[in-house]
């Protein structure tokens, strides 16, 4: 079958939910037996989001092949079976970088390099390259229609229909139909103007996904259909949902996937959404109530910074048939005021990844609290490094234990810069990135979770456990339960005499899905549930 292309754009406001819409559509098409791949086009000039502040961009999602990408790729992987790659996310910066490189090599034979056709051709070539082997390629264009930054991408997808034909391309536009409280009614004008902007560029949307906080009346659908030149059956409401994993079911109920396969002339089986129905049923009516998990971090004022982490904890709850309540705790507040009162009401403590010294002493205090009070603890990336430092200080007697990330002249560098990082002088794309193998020791909590010895997990770090301190810390009771054999790196640490105290250098949250929860999150939430029941 010739690959079909679905382009998803957004209008009126940013953060309208294009990524979730794209991911949900991917889930629906997979449930019909189609092979789906996904891609995000980002209009910013950064080469990738790897060096961007979490407060501006949110989470950086890491793929198996080490790409630092937009958080929407996390949605794509969680909702579908796709394993995405560097080809799945590209930016204006990457496009221009590639075109300029070709110009310097002389690939354009002395021609004048312009946005059209050179930039748009480069965009199209990247879309085609990523789509190889798929029945359907879903491509989300970042930004909002009307933004100057998005114009080259929109022009490229406009040309795509001309190149591939109407039967092989589909335009889905996500827009907003707000309810104006003072007027007591919903307004279609923002949607009309958004579509007008899109049509000025030469793109006539085939399907409109209308984001709204209540049901869209039939007369509103007719009005939108008339003014936007879209069939009434293709004006599809996307009403706010209590649970994001209910979105595929809601869009299926509105016949989105049916419209898509009909317009693209694809024959498929009927969708089997039973797994998604089971997930939503668990979220709405968990058998074992609620567990409270504290996330002690640095970026708690912007929870998008921990998007995959929050979702992975939810998946752990699904696996244990319980609801997970997340309590975000600012590590700096613990530094300033002490740990008492912040963690008294939680069933588990998690310290996530991060960079820089700010808030680290608060994390150490939180880890000590969880260790000494037998509260389930999970440390990830920097969280593992802080757990090693806390153990070195308070159990091994190394009062000066620290990381060279924070103090170059650290007296007891329990955590230090990886050897291959010492010659690196650029920040972007230079960390230890992507999937790396790890061997898990039998008879440990990590092995109990994975139930296998050879695993692969995704990384994003420069600093590591200092092997100089291995003997001392293992003598004092620390178990090094996961090792990268290739480079002899410590990947997982745990305490055998604690109900559940485990920390890992990698990011397991990047591989967790609602239909297949990650083993470590399943185990952590299970331990937290047990702790709650014993309190």
UniProtKB/Swiss-Prot annotation:
Mg(2+) binds at residues 72, 140. CDD domains: CTPS_N (cd03113), GATase1_CTP_Synthase (cd01746). SUPFAM superfamilies: Class I glutamine amidotransferase-like, P-loop containing nucleoside triphosphate hydrolases. GO terms for cellular component: cytosol. It catalyses: UTP + L-glutamine + ATP + H2O = CTP + L-glutamate + ADP + phosphate + 2 H(+); L-glutamine + H2O = L-glutamate + NH4(+); UTP + NH4(+) + ATP = CTP + ADP + phosphate + 2 H(+). Residues 292-534 form the Glutamine amidotransferase type-1 domain. Pathway: Pyrimidine metabolism; CTP biosynthesis via de novo pathway; CTP from UDP: step 2/2. One of its GO terms (biological process) is 'de novo' CTP biosynthetic process. Its EC number is 6.3.4.2. PROSITE patterns: GATASE_TYPE_1 (PS51273). Pfam families: CTP_synth_N (PF06418), GATase (PF00117). Residues 1-266 are annotated as: Amidoligase domain. GO terms for molecular function: ATP binding; CTP synthase activity; glutaminase activity; identical protein binding; metal ion binding. Allosterically activated by GTP, when glutamine is the substrate; GTP has no effect on the reaction when ammonia is the substrate. The allosteric effector GTP functions by stabilizing the protein conformation that binds the tetrahedral intermediate(s) formed during glutamine hydrolysis. Inhibited by the product CTP, via allosteric rather than competitive inhibition. The active site is at 381 (nucleophile), 507, 509. L-glutamine binds at residues 354, 382-385, 405, 462. The keyword ATP-binding applies. The keyword Nucleotide-binding applies. InterPro entries: Class_I_gatase-like, CTP_synthase, CTP_synthase_N, GATASE, GATase1_CTP_Synthase, P-loop_NTPase. UTP binds at residues 14, 187-192, 223. HAMAP family: PyrG. CTPSs have evolved a hybrid strategy for distinguishing between UTP and CTP. The overlapping regions of the product feedback inhibitory and substrate sites recognize a common feature in both compounds, the triphosphate moiety. To differentiate isosteric substrate and product pyrimidine rings, an additional pocket far from the expected kinase/ligase catalytic site, specifically recognizes the cytosine and ribose portions of the product inhibitor. Homotetramer. This is CTP synthase.
